[in-house]
Amino acid sequence: MSNYSCPRTHNKSNMSGRNEVKPISFSRGSFQIHHYSNSIHSPSLDGSPRQNFSQKYSFGSINSSNSSYDRSRDPSSVEQQLMREKSQALLKRKSSPMPKSSGLLYSTHTNKELSSIDKINDPSSNALICAGKAHLGYYKFSSNDNNKITLVHEFTQGFSSGSSQLNSLNPNLNKRRRQIKLSTIADVKSGFQKYNNYIAVCNNSTIISIYDINKNDNIDNPLVTSFSEHSRAVNSFDFNMTQTSLLISGGQDGQIKIWDLRSNSLSGSNKPDLNINAASDSIRDVKWMPGYNFSSFNQSYDGKQTGNSEYKFASIHDSGLLLKFDIRQPNQVEKKINAHTGPGLCLNWHPNQDYIATGGRDGKCCIWYIGDVVNDAPVTSLGSMTPNTLHTSNVNYYQSNATSLALPEMTINTGFPVTKLKFRPAYEKNVMDSLLAISSMGEEAEVNIYSLCRKFIPKHVLLTTSPSQGLVWWDKSLIFNTDRSNRINGWDIDLEPTVLDNLPKALATWRDIDGNGLLVIDQDSGTYTANEEYIPLVFDKRRRQSHRLLNPSINDNNSITKTKYLDSIKKANSNTIISPTSVEKTGNIKQPNLHSNKSIIGMTSPMYMTQFMPPTNSPSPLNEPLEFKGIQSPLIVALDFPHILNNMRLSKITSKKHLSKSSDIAAIKESPIQVFQYLARELEFSFSKDRKLDSRSSIIKRKSISDDSGSQVDVIKKIGFTDTTKWTNLINRKTDGEIAEKSSDRISALSTSSESIKNDIDEKSEHSKNNAYLNLEKKLSHGTHGMPEDAIEAQHKVDILIELVTICSHNASVYSYIDDVPNFKIWTLIKDSLLWDLKDITGIEEAINSNDSIEIKDKFQYFENLDHERALKNSSSQTQFSDIPSEIESFVTENPEALTSASLELDNDIEEGTKESKRPISNLQQQLKAENTAVMDTPSDVFVTATTDGGHFRDNSKVTRDENKIETNDNTNLLNIGKVNTENAIKIDSESVIEDVAPGSKSIEIPTLTRGRTRTSFIDTFMTNPLHNMERPDRSLLLAQDSAASLNDQSSPISKVSSIKSSSNVPHSLNSMIKLSQGKMHSRTRSIGKSPIKLSGFLSPKERSLSLPLENILKKNKSAEKVAHNDQFRPPWETGKLLKQLFNQAVETGNILLAINIITLFQDLYNITTIDVVKSSLLQFVEILHRYELFEIATALLKYCSWNNILEGNGGNSTVQLFCDKCGKLIVNEFSKTNFNEELKRTGNKDSMKKFGYWYCDACKKPNSLCVLCEKPMKKLVMCVLACGHEGHFQCLRDWFLNEGMNECPAGDIQVI
């Protein structure tokens, strides 16, 4: 689209008359966002003067229609048609797809403080007037000269001494004339028509000064006159648009004063022509009713004109009151409305409708109808009424100073105090098409432009460098503002994108905790214009007509009693009809007195004599909400998954219902302080062994407390589910007793799976558990003797990663206990990422995944027989492993007796186990119990069968289901092999089988399972484990778990699910991980490479790594780490990359605990950030812990952290604030720092940050003082000459004074140093 910009000197009119059209009203906006279809509007012509029309000012009677241009030059009908066609063509041109770029056309910076802005109402010049604390400037802007804003004249300079007129007007001004200083609450306004060269400002807090912009202060004093009758600060003043000589002002003294420039300019009188007392209620803003004459420009305008606009004005007060006056009856308030709950700050009239917009400190912008109440309004056309319209006055009601109980027609919640607001000066048939510009005195550096059609989404957001101070519409498209950075900005809103252009039109999002679980929105973006076919209720003849609030005269015999009146108001608010007894029928209703001379139509309708109806013919909150016919609201689909799932689950698990309202959790969640203290005590910040041993008793104590209070209600009950969740299994289980029985069977199965493990450690003996842990450490240290350095390094890294995995599980459970879902997900994600690292180090190949899944039942058995198991298989596609959050935690916490020294020696008899493993499959059960052999180190995704005759595998497709049933002596199923599928069986050449096979040995017949199960999500991990423990398991128990898991590997190795794909299934991976940590992989008597079964021809490259010695594996891992340094080869789940992103997110969101946890646990391993940042963060965190009286946590953190001298980080440091010696502002330079950082990330050039420093100022774009000798910026060490104050580089001044022996300053100071 072309960036065509209309010149601002086009023909526009300065309207003078007020067209009195009957209001198009509306009630309060509904709570839903309504979107309107596109509609074609007739182009609204601007309200500013047109250049082609010469100035012609008329000062006739008040009832005459004043015009701002020469009617003799009024364009003919042909010319008007051409103008309309050009305007429509221009609108079509602008309606084409526009690039989403800013519509900022003008921007200039001034050296003076600015606080207010207004336009010069002169059609011959594009001029603005800006005022501030010590500045009053006359500016001009031009669209032809690169869109520049130029300062033409400044009026704050000293005047000539010969100004007798000034002294005669106000002798006190003679003392101030040499130093004009405008007040900090300065306002500036420009006159109209004859007085369009006059501007009014506040010279100080109580004096209003009138300047003539056509006078040069070098020749004549531009000060025309001044008014100083206010006793306190003047907050606002305004010129009358029709009676242009009238000026109104309001101040803190609660006085409204009206001045006539004609009577005060020459007579020297300083008295106001009219004074209105507002009962000591400070006035924040006061405005005349505007008098635009839109009928002169829009031939389709059919409203009636009136001459009353020059008499009416409105004011907003500190108490929040909105008052409307008529100067013909100054002692009477026409309207009195409680507009805001706090102080009202500003107001603005609608250009052609009887509405006022007010803004207050309560953060609300309210639209009020302040026109006369309409009783019966037959509709002739949209926006007009018949001459028989009744105007009912409320004079007597407001004479009693009673406040109107009406609510606003619309409320826009901005969220910040509204200090400036102005309607766009354009004629609108439908008031809902009006645009309203709003700015704030807060920290919001923007100007919001709202369309009344969509009060929830602004149409335009005009961004500024700092908060806005003032704004003004030049015409219907161009708007100017001033901000705190002393900038003047101008936007063309036709070139500015709307907010809807950048919003998504369809959205689907999850809610993790309470409320609607899933929200889906699909809608059309809509427009910011109302439907032209929409007729407001005030003009709808199909609606029943009545009064607004029934405001009768106080002396009227038909008045309503106080009690019944309040009852009627309450019932009207609920849109219900009040009974006929609410009104006493004591006589006919009187005809109220009117301000106008129009005839009165009687109110004798029997409807008002029988009942009180909520008004439907006037814009009031008592009406029904606006009914936008033909507009389809957005479709919002809300699925409350947490509520559904909790009801389904708790209905089957009734004993767990009370846990959802646990008193312990409720006590923790009472305040954020208690939550922080709980997390600081429970989270693990270090994996030091000393601390773990010391805290083991506290962990056991915590476990007992948790067991006594019942199982934990997991957070996963409150989040969604997937297609593989276990909630259906929980629903299908019959009773809680069955669940408890199966849990007991699971423990008994574990206790009987290995008698040697049970005999070594008593589950009730904590002393033996500690001894086992110490023995384990000795064996691990003994296993490192004679190992290569690479193997020792890999073993050390595996030890650390395993410890970190357990810590992550513990921290995740801590957050799940308090229903903190986001942090629970983060720690689960970190744990899964660490398991990836473990997989890469150990070279464990992940298990086979297929579309189908099969349940493999082993030592963790819930069921008593196979038939019951297969019956439940139809209702769930998950295995029993999904009932435990992680093999690391569940086996340890529920079976602490499973650890023995025998578990550490399972690999010593590897050869014997290999020979024994070649027995027939029918003897496998006895073989496991009698010999206690270990699993053969065959990759989990390949299972082979050899025969003694060198032949191929025999067909196992005829194996029946009965052959797969294996019974133990204790009636516990240890192995369940499903139907065999031999199509994927691997056939090995006889030459690769007969090697190292003793003659006469029997063949091994173990079927191949080709079906795996689907990935288990983290949701399944915790949904199916409400008994998830919070304590972290001991390392000794972790190793014991792997020993038992190795038995399961021998029974069905192909059924293992990759630990990387699910954190709940890691037995096979951890088996090899622990073996590597024990230092046994390098010293085995038979490695995979020496296996009698050669699989090299059938293995993938990654699988072949399992048959290599440990040294080759480590070399391969090293080469992989080198490649990983390149970001394009790094997977998105790479741990170092993930942790850095999580750390940055924690810093940005203020998650202190997560940031410190990542630093203390992962800094040494993954180098998350710099050491300076680490020490500074730990120091600040220690201070926070001291603030919350967590001294023991702070001491433990300092004791076990990897860095020294944490507390000395700020011992000798001091904070020095540097201020710019040019503009006086604090040097922060965040803007340039951000730019240089982006350049560094984009280019990778480290020299980019060398440009950054604090030797320059971003605010004024100037460097600080230059070196007195070399005249270059001082970026590093600086020295200052105390005698004269000149500064210079240390090197320069050292050479000057020491090497060259000078004793004077390089600047040439005479004083000898």
From Swiss-Prot:
The keyword Zinc-finger applies. Keywords: Metal-binding, Repeat, Vacuole, WD repeat, Zinc, Zinc-finger. Residues 70-83 have a biased composition (Basic and acidic residues). PANTHER family: GATOR COMPLEX PROTEIN WDR24 (PTHR46200:SF1). Belongs to the WD repeat RTC1 family. May be involved in a process influencing telomere capping. This is Restriction of telomere capping protein 1. It comes from Vanderwaltozyma polyspora (strain ATCC 22028 / DSM 70294 / BCRC 21397 / CBS 2163 / NBRC 10782 / NRRL Y-8283 / UCD 57-17). The gene is RTC1.
